[in-house]
C-alpha cells in the first residue's frame, strides 16, 4: 500500500512546488512557471519566456522553495525517528536541545557582527551550537554505555532552558536591528535564501535522511521492546546512540 502512496505524494510535492513558485508580488502564470522549470532543467528551450520571469522564478523563488522542502523533509524524518525511539507520538528533535543550541549560535553570530559579513557565518554558528547542545545532553544523560530515555528527556529540557536563558541575555545586550535579524531567523524566514544556501545544506541533509531511513527496520524492532530487539541480534543502546547522533546533525542542518 505504501508504494502506491509514495508516487502520489511525489506528484503532489511537484505540484505544490510549481504553485509556490508562481505565488508572489509579481504574478507568473502556472504554465509559464512550469515552462521555466523545464527550460532550466535543459529539457526544452521555451523562447516565449521573458528574462525577468526567468530570473524571478529561477534565481529568487526556486531556492526558497527548495530550502523549504529540504528543511521540511529533514524535520519530518527526524521527528518520525524520535517518535519511534521514544514510542511517543509527541516526541520531536527539540527535546535534544538542538533548537536552543542553534538559537544561541545564531544570536552569537549576529551579536559579533559576523552574520552581516557572510551568509555562511550564521548557519555555521547555528550548526555548531546545535551539535554542542546535543553533545552536552548526551553527556548529562549517559549512564555508562546506556542512555536512559527519561534522563535524556530531562537533560534536554534542562539544557534547552539554560541555553534559552543565555540567548535572552544576549538579545538584551545587542541592538534593535540585530534583535529583528534574530527574530526573523528564529521564525524560519526564507526571503533571503539563495542558491548558496541550497548548495550548503542539500547534500548533508539528503545524506542524513537516507541514513535515517536505512534504520527503518531497526526502529520497527525497537518498538517491540529492548528484550525482543536483543533476541534478534540488535544492540538497542548502540542503535539509539547512532540514531540520536544522526537526528542531531540532520536537525542542526535544518534549523541553521
Per-region residue spans from a language model:
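Alpha-helical transmembrane segments in inner-membrane proteins
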Residues: 1-256
Amino acid at each position: 500500500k505504501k508504494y502506491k502512496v509514495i508516487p502520489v505524494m511525489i506528484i503532489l510535492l511537484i505540484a505544490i512546488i510549481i504553485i509556490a513558485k508562481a505565488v508572489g508580488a509579481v504574478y507568473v502564470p502556472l504554465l509559464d512557471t512550469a515552462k521555466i522549470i523545464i527550460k532550466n532543467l535543459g529539457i526544452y528551450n521555451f523562447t516565449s519566456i521573458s528574462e525577468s520571469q526567468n530570473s524571478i522564478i529561477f534565481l529568487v523563488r526556486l531556492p526558497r522553495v527548495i530550502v523549504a522542502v529540504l528543511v521540511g523533509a529533514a524535520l519530518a524524518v527526524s521527528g518520525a525517528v524520535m517518535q519511534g525511539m521514544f514510542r511517543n507520538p509527541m516526541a520531536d528533535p527539540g527535546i535534544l536541545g538542538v533548537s536552543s543550541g542553534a538559537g544561541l549560535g545564531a544570536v552569537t553570530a549576529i551579536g559579533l557582527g559576523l552574520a552581516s559579513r557572510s551568509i555562511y557565518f550564521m548557519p555555521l554558528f547555528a550548526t555548531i551550537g546545535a551539535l554542542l547542545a546535543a553533545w552536552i545532553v548526551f553527556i548529562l544523560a549517559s549512564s555508562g554505555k546506556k542512555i536512559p530515555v527519561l534522563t535524556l528527556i530531562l537533560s534536554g529540557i534542562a539544557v534547552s532552558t539554560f541555553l534559552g536563558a543565555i540567548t535572552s541575555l544576549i538579545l538584551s545586550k545587542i541592538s534593535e536591528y540585530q534583535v529583528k535579524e534574530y527574530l526573523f531567523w528564529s521564525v524560519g524566514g526564507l526571503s533571503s535564501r539563495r542558491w548558496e544556501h541550497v548548495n550548503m545544506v542539500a547534500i548533508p541533509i539528503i545524506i542524513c535522511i537516507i541514513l535515517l531511513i536505512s534504520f527503518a527496520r531497526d526502529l520497527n524492532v525497537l518498538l517491540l521492546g529492548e528484550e525482543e530487539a536483543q533476541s534478534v541480534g540488535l544492540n538497542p543502546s548502540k542503535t539509539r546512540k547512532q540514531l540520536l547522533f544522526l537526528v542531531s546533525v540532520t536537525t542542526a542542518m535544518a534549523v541553521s
